[in-house]
Design a protein with these regions (language model features):
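Aromatic, loop-rich ligand-recognition surfaces of beta-strand-rich domains
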Residues: 2-37
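N-terminal catalytic cores of secreted or lumenal carbohydrate-active enzymes
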Residues: 33-188
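Structural preference for beta-strand elements that scaffold enzyme active sites
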Residues: 57-62, 91-98, 153-161, 204-209, ...
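Acidic-and-aromatic substrate-binding clefts and catalytic sites of carbohydrate-active enzymes
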Residues: 62-78, 215-222, 242-250, 266-276, ...
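Active-site beta-loop-alpha junctions enriched in small/polar residues
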Residues: 65-68, 102-104, 161-167, 211-213, ...
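Surface-exposed amphipathic alpha-helices with a cationic face
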Residues: 141-152, 224-238, 282-286
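Aromatic-lined carbohydrate-recognition surfaces of secreted/lumenal glycan-active proteins
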Residues: 154-171, 176-192, 209-210, 228-250, ...
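Substrate-binding cleft of secreted/luminal carbohydrate-active enzymes
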Residues: 206, 246, 260-275, 279-347
Length: 347
């Protein structure tokens, strides 16, 4: 007898009771119970990098910008390239970059709340501002390609965020120029709200990220996200998701239309979080065919406890197998933590 049901954070089961009967006529023999299919469903394996998912990127860094912080060409160099202590480019580093907002929108709402058209327009202007963010990534990528002799048609991947237009937002703003503000309670209006692309030579738009880290179980959310996934797919892009540890919706990620989902172990930021989060996260993502987020605290270079917590993610990659043949997404709490090692000053 097997019970399968979704259990999210702060949920559990007190008791299960099975009532059988002596008459076994019509029962399925265990040998014919298709247990191999059940086993495969519960052990899908890690999501490996492949051209069919996120256009092949395997190590994607989350690039948080804000109302008062943007990335320059110089900022991107140690993300794009492995640098020695003299700043010489020795190899590539991350091959994908996700642009997402840290903090609030200009309207004052958080990223996962009821953002409106002017917020999204501001976000696009920031991402594609001259000399900053995506534009800076393009010029930095050109330098790395030239130094390493990479093929002219090689492109680093970048991704844009889709922020949560709450279904009860009835005055989003006029997207399609028909003089009528879009109503996010209507799915046909949500289908119009798709981020824009820009033509680059050294970087390539490779997908969209659904920003909200948890999904409620309402039929409305299911339809909304699937509609957005359909829109991105029609344009040749993937929609993906990075849920927090055991967030609601994790076990149904594929049913929402995501090309992949990358779960956060959420071990590194809170010193009271148990080490078991690493193993449990690895077990869950392997069972569900997901990938993993590697997280590092901004205090890792100054406080030993946080540094050691980061090392547990790397050890877990060896112990549980997600170091190879698994997409990794990297959450850096403070800019520069991952690449301070190339500097000449002791840390």
């Amino acid at each position: 007898m097997r019970f399968v049901y979704g259990v999210y954070t702060w949920a559990g089961c007190a008791e299960l009771t099975v009532y059988g009967k002596k008459n076994a006529s019509g029962a399925t023999a265990l040998a014919n119970a298709n247990l191999e299919k059940v086993r495969m469903a519960l052990d899908a394996g890690y999501q490996a990098p492949t051209k069919s998912v996120l256009k092949g990127a395997g190590d994607i860094c989350l690039m948080y910008h804000s109302l008062d912080y943007d990335y320059t060409e110089k900022d991107f160099m140690p993300y794009l390239a492995y640098l020695d202590t003299d700043g010489n480019i020795k190899d590539t580093m991350f091959d994908g970059f996700l642009f997402l907002l840290s903090g609030k929108f200009p309207s004052g709402v958080a990223q996962h709340m009821n953002s409106v058209k002017t917020d999204w327009e501001w976000e696009l202007k920031q991402v594609f501002a001259n000399g900053k963010n995506a534009m800076a990534l393009e010029t930095a990528a050109a330098k790395v390609k030239k130094e390493l002799g990479l093929a002219d048609d090689y492109k680093f991947k970048y991704y844009l965020s889709v922020y949560y237009p709450r279904p009860d937002t009835t005055n989003f703003g006029d997207v399609d120029g028909d003089g009528v503000s879009e109503d996010c309670s209507k799915f046909e209006d949500c289908r119009k709200i798709i981020n824009k692309n820009a033509a680059f030579k050294n970087i390539e738009l490779a997908g969209f990220y659904w920003f909200h880290e948890a999904i409620d179980s309402s039929e409305n959310s299911y339809k909304l996200i699937n509609n957005i996934a359909d829109q991105t797919k029609e344009r040749g892009y993937d929609l993906f998701w990075i849920p927090y540890y055991c967030a609601s919706g994790v076990s149904e990620w594929a049913e929402y239309g995501f090309a992949t989902a990358c779960m956060q172990p959420n071990y590194v930021f809170n010193l009271t979080t148990p080490l078991s989060n690493i193993k449990n996260a690895a077990d869950i993502i392997k069972r569900l065919g997901m990938c993993i987020e590697i997280e590092i605290s901004g205090d890792a270079l100054s406080k030993d406890a946080y540094y050691r917590r980061y090392l547990e993610y790397l050890k877990g990659g060896i112990y549980y197998g997600y170091m190879k043949d698994c997409i990794h997404m990297y959450c850096v709490q403070q800019s520069g933590v991952f690449f301070q090692c190339h500097g000449k000053v002791d840390i």
